[in-house]
């Protein structure tokens, strides 16, 4: 069973959100998208540590800066879906038999709704119900009992949770570590792995597993948290760097075909570590939903890679939040979800499992995920043909006083990956985009591609396309008053009669395209803003307008 959708209306910092989830989810967004409110909602409503949650006055949304405009109603709908058609009949789901709803796609789902009503006297009422596929309440004998069973089966575990940290620091975590069970499980996993040694000795396997425990502990306790914190690690590995390398090899052993039994052992180890920390007891049928907040915290990129691989081996649904381009480079783009706060809602953008063709997905993975993962955080992409434009545009924008990084604008060359996959991807992910093309034959084809994507809408074309009235950026800048730079770089006097193309070719030959582009941009800087071509100034204004949400 997985949590398939979360719908929130009027809870804390979220006015309205509809978020589709899959087995693996990495959420990104700017600071104000409502991360804490979403994670709090899941943590409070599906917490295995306490009884069913009752809404409070502070849970109701209010417009920013207007606390007196606080809403009096909120509701949250959690949609759970069986992992495969027919799985709802297995033993552990039988107590929820009355709550399952058959749907047209062949799957059964549970629609669990929670509502909060705030009265004038400050009192708050919490209502629970299970819905059918049309949104009507199902007549269930004991709703609270069913809700408790649902939470027992799919509790939320919030890694690096601040409330848990505070309990550790306050010394209120029960000091009942189950060290012996953990040691036995580690020994068993070590024995299992040593039967397929992959060139690792028993000692190396144990060092790697020691690093595994250390890593899992990293997410449940804070360094130097005082005496109340009981470490399962008896001692640090003598060579920590080597231990991490062994853990990486163990990860790969577990990840290969036939490694399912190892994953089950790993899950048992994970559960034991949780219980050894004294935080909670999980039901034997529980399949927790992991909430992982910013897993890059205090981890070197190499260790983050090993850690992320280990977390991905746990056979559990995961929702992670991150601000790390490094972590995005380790994540298939299909798992990434961008959340953007709009005036009336928080919009969720993701490709989903059938978002791009195999070929387009491969190109995006190489061009964006591996080489420019931080561009997924951008508000707007300015797509240019090649390296020359990248240098010139970034530098000329800076000369005009525009700081693209601070505005969330990324200049990305598209010649290598193709224009259409990038535009399709940007649209699906809610990233604004604008294309700058040359005036040659290739540029005209790119412009035609943009027009076809915009259904030949002239208004939309003005927002998304700028075409240079010259063969390329070099010819354009030559004609815009920078001919002396080209002559200087080509070492040709200005009064020598020579074909324009030859002058540019010699200038490139005696330096390089990027060097020539930088020299032109630097010359523009010396001359001042007035020397920047009007066409490019207009394009900068348009791109800034797109990045700012078309607000100005």
Curated annotation (Swiss-Prot):
Coiled coil: none
Entry binding sites for ATP: 29-36
Metal-binding recorded as keyword: no
Pfam families membership: DUF2813, OLD-like_TOPRIM
InterPro entries the UniProt entry points to: DUF2813 (IPR022602), P-loop_NTPase (IPR027417), TOPRIM_dom (IPR006171), TOPRIM_OLD (IPR034139)
PROSITE patterns in the cross-refs: TOPRIM
Domain of life: Bacteria
Keyword ATP-binding included in the entry's annotation: yes
Domain Toprim: 379-469
Keywords per UniProt: ATP-binding, Nucleotide-binding
GO molecular function per UniProt: ATP binding
A biological process from GO: double-strand break repair
PANTHER family per the UniProt record, alphabetical: DNA REPLICATION AND REPAIR PROTEIN RECF, HOMOLOGY WITH RECF PROTEIN
Protein name: Uncharacterized protein YbjD
Organism per entry: Escherichia coli (strain K12)
Gene that this sequence comes from: ybjD
């Amino acid at each position: 069973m997985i949590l398939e959708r979360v719908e929130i209306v009027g809870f804390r910092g979220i006015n309205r959100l509809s978020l589709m989830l899959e087995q693996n989810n990495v959420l990104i967004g700017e600071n104000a998208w409502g991360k804490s409110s979403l994670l709090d909602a899941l943590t409070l409503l599906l917490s295995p540590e306490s009884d069913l949650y009752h809404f409070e006055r502070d849970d109701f949304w209010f417009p920013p800066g207007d606390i007196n405009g606080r809403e009096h109603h909120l509701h949250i709908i959690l949609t759970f879906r069986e992992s495969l058609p027919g799985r709802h009949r297995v033993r552990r789901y039988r107590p929820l038999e009355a709550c399952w709803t058959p749907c047209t796609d062949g799957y059964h789902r549970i629609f669990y709704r929670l509502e909060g009503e705030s009265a004038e006297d400050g009192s708050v009422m919490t209502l629970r119900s299970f819905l059918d596929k049309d949104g009507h309440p199902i007549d269930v004998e004991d709703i609270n009992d069913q809700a408790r069973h649902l939470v027992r089966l799919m509790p939320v575990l919030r890694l690096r949770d601040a409330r848990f940290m505070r309990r550790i620091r306050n010394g209120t975590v029960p000091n009942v570590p189950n060290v012996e069970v953990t040691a036995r499980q580690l020994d068993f996993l070590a024995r299992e792995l040593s039967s397929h040694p992959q060139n690792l000795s028993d000692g190396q396997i144990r060092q790697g597993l020691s690093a595994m425990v250390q890593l899992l502990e990293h997410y449940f306790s804070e360094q130097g948290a005082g005496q109340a914190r009981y470490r399962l690690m008896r001692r640090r590995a003598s060579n920590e760097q080597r231990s991490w390398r062994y853990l990486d090899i163990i990860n790969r052993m577990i990840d290969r075909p036939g490694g399912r039994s190892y994953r089950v052992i790993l899950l048992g180890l994970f559960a034991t570590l949780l219980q050894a920390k004294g935080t909670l007891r999980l039901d034997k049928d529980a399949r927790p939903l992991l909430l992982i907040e910013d897993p890059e915290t205090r981890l070197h990129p190499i260790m983050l890679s090993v850690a992320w691989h280990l977390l991905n081996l746990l056979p559990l649904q995961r929702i992670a939040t991150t601000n790390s381009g490094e972590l995005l480079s380790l994540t298939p783009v299909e798992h990434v979800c961008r959340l953007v706060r709009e005036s009336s809602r928080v919009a969720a953008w993701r490709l989903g499992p059938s978002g791009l063709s195999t070929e387009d997905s491969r190109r995006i993975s190489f061009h964006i995920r591996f080489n420019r993962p931080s561009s997924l955080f951008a508000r707007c992409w300015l797509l240019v043909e090649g390296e020359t434009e990248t240098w010139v545009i970034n530098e000329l924008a800076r000369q005009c006083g525009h700081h693209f990084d601070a505005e969330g604008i990324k200049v990305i060359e598209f010649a290598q990956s193709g224009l259409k996959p990038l535009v399709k991807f940007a649209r699906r992910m809610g990233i604004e985009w604008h294309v700058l093309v040359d005036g040659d034959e290739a540029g005209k084809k790119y412009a035609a591609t943009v027009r076809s994507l915009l259904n030949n809408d002239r208004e939309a074309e003005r927002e998304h396309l700028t075409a240079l009235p010259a063969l390329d950026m070099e010819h354009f800048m030559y004609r815009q008053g920078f001919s002396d730079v080209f002559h200087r770089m080509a070492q040709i006097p200005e009064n020598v009669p020579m074909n324009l193309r030859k002058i540019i070719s010699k200038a490139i030959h005696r330096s390089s395209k990027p060097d020539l582009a930088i020299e032109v941009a630097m010359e523009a800087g010396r001359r001042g803003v007035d020397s920047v071509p009007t066409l490019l100034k207009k394009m900068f204004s348009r791109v800034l307008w797109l990045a700012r949400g078309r607000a100005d």
